[in-house]
Amino acid sequence: MRRVILVGMLLGLAGVGWGQSADSVAPMGSMSMPHGAGNMSAHMMLSATRPLKPGDQEKADAIAAAAKAAIAPYVDYKKALADGFVIFLPNVPQKIYHFTNYSRGIAAARKFDPSMPTSLLYEKTTDGGYKLVGAMYTDRQRAPEVELDERIPLSVARWHEHVNFCKAPAGQETAYFGKDAKFGLLGSISTEKDCVAAGGTFQPNLFGWMVHVYPFEMDRKAVWSVDRDDDGDMKGLKM
């Protein structure tokens, strides 16, 4: 969860986005949060789960297989860099590092291509390198759940969005952090009215839908886990 909070907050500050707004989402609700993250449930949304339909698991398996083939050439992270992927926050300690190709993100807002994930997911190695573990697919902010389900069955995978972000006014950036945080994805402010009153800039949705896939895993549930990179702070949300 710490990585999700930091990535979401800083992407919001940078103004990066795939689309415009959100549709048909289910709030995370009550869960274990890191210290100072008691307001996180107001800033994170998950797609609703759906009953497993005939063919859903097979479709998800096929997408995972396509993802595995697509990312296999990037076992060497240096090739990813050479091919236009950019490490997000390389100097910030994270459990999972996103190597993102923003051109792919733009294309994904228009069409889903399992062979072209927006981001490659790596774990840092003890020698300072990176180990390839998965990929991330994205979709536009306006995408309804029926579209997400068409891309990857919601009975198997859950997409997530970062929402209700209040950007702090200049000089109040320290209020992003701590148990009394007001702004950002840790903040107590989660409505436009309260954000404007505090002098902030409100963003209802930071950058659209995202879903992680870990195609090298043998367990189907682990392949579409929603909390592999969350240091155990999202217990109960694994698929």
Language-model-derived ranges and their functions:
Residues 1-4:
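Positively charged n-region of N-terminal signal peptides that target proteins for export
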Residues 7-15:
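Bacterial N-terminal signal peptides
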